[in-house]
């Protein structure tokens, strides 16, 4: 029996990963996934930088400590994980080269910073022209900014390193990472810092994909305003101790976080419902589909249960089976991008 084009594509995607790399370029972190032997290896750097006093002595100390930095116009910037350490030391905030999932238009130092961060996690290609897939956000439904510029700049950085770069939607990457056993059919949701990315896929082919700019940073800012706290403190509590399954006595910040998490989940589900209404020629999906949740904003205890409860109330226009967290919520985008890169490499 002759196999269809879709069946052949799924077989390739399920094949053993050999060459290629996957890169998740997020607002908070840059991550890379690649294969070493039979293991998938992940590298990560915080997507941030911090200006420190520029002197020969400082430069020597940083060199000896192997701290990543850039010197630009007589200014010295520490980049990556160490930037946060320096910021905490001086009780100041780091700066980010990305805003809402794309290269920041207001941060004039963004380009050299993101280039160095990408180079530090991706490293040299195994051979010239090795395929690397990098994640990109879907077109935002609630904002206007230039995704094309972002894509072309990242492509340029990776080409300079010797790669053949290709882009993949962030939500689609989650599906490739998590839904091999379901023939890559389902909904992938990436709850990041700057955006929530959504993709509905049928037999590995995206049906619709989009993003919204209400996400983790938005929650921090709204809660901070509501309770008169700093966004940094709200974020620290959200990341370290928030439990969305907790009932009874909640602190003021916990109560506000719970309210805004509800609002975010409702907002995402309502936008998914609208996309179903707007999309023509939806495929006939016979079985209930899975929804995969991932990203740093999805990490608090009880998030998946909270999502399920709200979904039961709001209901999608197609049957939903499993609603579950990705196996590695912070790594699934990079892993999915690696699956795509490896599938392309196997066709060579």
Region spans (language model):
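Nucleotide/phosphate-binding catalytic cleft detector across ATP-hydrolyzing
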Residues: 1-188, 203-212, 216, 221-290, ...
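A structural feature that tracks compact, well-ordered secondary-structure segments
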Residues: 197-199
């Amino acid at each position: 029996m002759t196999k269809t084009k879709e069946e052949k594509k799924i077989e390739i995607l399920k094949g053993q990963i050999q060459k290629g790399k996957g890169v998740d370029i997020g607002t908070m972190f840059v991550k890379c996934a690649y294969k070493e032997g039979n293991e998938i290896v992940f590298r990560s750097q915080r997507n941030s930088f911090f200006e420190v006093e520029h002197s020969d002595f400082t430069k020597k100390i940083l060199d000896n400590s192997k701290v990543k930095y850039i010197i630009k116009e007589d200014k010295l910037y520490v980049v990556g994980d160490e930037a946060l350490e320096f910021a905490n030391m001086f009780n100041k905030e780091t700066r980010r080269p990305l805003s809402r999932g794309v290269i920041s238009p207001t941060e004039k130092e963004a380009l050299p910073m993101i280039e160095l961060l990408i180079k530090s996690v991706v490293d040299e290609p195994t051979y010239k022209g090795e395929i690397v897939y990098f994640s990109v956000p879907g077109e935002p439904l609630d904002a206007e900014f230039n995704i094309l510029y972002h894509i072309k700049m990242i492509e340029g950085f990776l080409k300079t390193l010797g790669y053949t770069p290709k882009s993949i939607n962030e939500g689609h990457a989650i599906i490739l990472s998590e839904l091999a056993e379901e023939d890559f059919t389902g909904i992938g949701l990436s709850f990041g810092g700057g955006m929530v990315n959504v993709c509905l896929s049928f037999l590995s082919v995206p049906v619709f994909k989009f993003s919204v700019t209400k996400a983790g940073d938005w929650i921090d800012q709204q809660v901070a305003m509501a309770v008169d706290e700093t966004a940094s403190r709200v974020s620290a509590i959200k990341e370290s101790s928030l439990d969305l399954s907790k009932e009874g006595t909640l602190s003021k910040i916990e109560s506000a976080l719970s309210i805004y998490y509800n609002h975010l989940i409702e907002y995402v589900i309502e936008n998914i419902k609208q996309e179903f209404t707007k999309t023509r020629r939806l495929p006939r999906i016979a079985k209930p589909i899975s929804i995969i949740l991932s990203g740093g904003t999805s990490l608090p205890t009880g998030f998946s249960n909270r999502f399920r409860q709200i979904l039961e109330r709001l209901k999608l226009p197609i049957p939903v089976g499993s609603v579950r967290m990705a196996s590695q919520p912070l790594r699934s985008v990079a892993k999915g991008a690696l699956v795509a890169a490896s599938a392309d490499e196997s066709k060579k």
